[in-house]
Amino acid sequence: MSTASVMDLVRDDLRAFAGYASARTSALQGDVWLNANESAWGNPADPDASTRRYPDPQPKGLRAALAQLYGCAPEQLLIGRGSDEAIDLLVRGLCVPERDAVVVTPPVFGMYAVCARLQNAPLVEVPLVDGADGLHADVPVIVQAALDAKAKLVFLCSPSNPAGSAIPLAEIEVALQALQGKAVVVVDEAYGEFSDVPSAIGLLARYDNLAVLRTLSKAHALAAARIGSLIANAELIALLRRCQAPYPVPTPCAVMAEQALSAPALAVTQRRVTEIRAERARLHAALVQVAGVRQVYPSQGNFLLVRFDDAEAAFQALLEAGVVVRDQRAVPRLSDALRITIGTPEQNDRVLGALQRKQEAA
């Protein structure tokens, strides 16, 4: 598929959009900077005055480090405020209100639908299939729904939140082939570090209707820093950058994120991912033995989706033990389910102890 094809999916009124030219986008040189109406003095709370100036909109060092981490070119990567901003940019950049649909696969991360509704884009839901191997995406049905609705965006969460299932690359490629020139397939890999399925980023060389979301919030333990990456066709990335807020990456967050991508920090992250995967298996095996647990779904994320005979009682028992989990009961088709993040071994033991005590007291 040619580069022009993916840009044909962009809203007509945005293809030549220049965006806002901030003071940091100029190539001017000097040692006295009086072009952005910044303070000439630092704040007492900022002893080295490092935050008195506006940040680099796309910090070069961080962008290069993220590109190396994910295996793409820097110009194929956009840094934003978590994956949420990237989702919003994609919807606003591609979808004409009341015309261009967005396909989602519930139960799934809610921000895809939120952004679609804020843009007044038609929302098409293709529910995950609850089978013997867990809740999984039916890719042929998703593709047909996208074609029928003339959708511009198809969001595939892999591993899926809260289901925990991952989509094989061969199935993602089926969607990319079928939707060439028609829709961008967005693969959300927020939990990719915990998965056995390789990243879809490797498919970008063949399919420019692919976009991949990554984050430092989960495996890299920087949720408060809000560092998300959108990896896609370079021309699409440039367009979405023009649609983005002028200064999306605060300097302190960029500095911390770049430090988190150093070799020593990445080695620690990898060890923790290995520990989480081991704890995920241990907790899964233990939960299926707990009376009152109806089903524990297999997971490729850092969490488990669990169905209970009495989810309210389980939720309250965990709260009484000081353990807060994600209540899924208001989510369609998950009225008996809780999502439990994989914690430390001690935290996971508290989960098991609380649920076992609940059953003993019943």
UniProtKB/Swiss-Prot annotation:
Its cofactor is pyridoxal 5'-phosphate. Keywords: Amino-acid biosynthesis, Aminotransferase, Histidine biosynthesis, Pyridoxal phosphate, Transferase. CDD domains: AAT_like. Gene3D superfamilies: Aspartate Aminotransferase, domain 1 (3.90.1150.10), Type I PLP-dependent aspartate aminotransferase-like (Major domain) (3.40.640.10). The modification N6-(pyridoxal phosphate)lysine is found at residue 218. It comes from the Bacteria. One of its GO terms (biological process) is L-histidine biosynthetic process. It catalyses: L-histidinol phosphate + 2-oxoglutarate = 3-(imidazol-4-yl)-2-oxopropyl phosphate + L-glutamate. It is an enzyme of class 2 (transferase). Pathway: Amino-acid biosynthesis; L-histidine biosynthesis; L-histidine from 5-phospho-alpha-D-ribose 1-diphosphate: step 7/9. GO terms for molecular function: histidinol-phosphate transaminase activity; pyridoxal phosphate binding. Its EC number is 2.6.1.9. The keyword Magnesium does not apply. Homodimer. NCBIfam families: hisC. Belongs to the class-II pyridoxal-phosphate-dependent aminotransferase family. Histidinol-phosphate aminotransferase subfamily. HAMAP family: HisC_aminotrans_2 (MF_01023). PANTHER family: HISTIDINOL-PHOSPHATE AMINOTRANSFERASE, HISTIDINOL-PHOSPHATE AMINOTRANSFERASE-RELATED. This is Histidinol-phosphate aminotransferase. It comes from Xanthomonas campestris pv. campestris (strain B100).
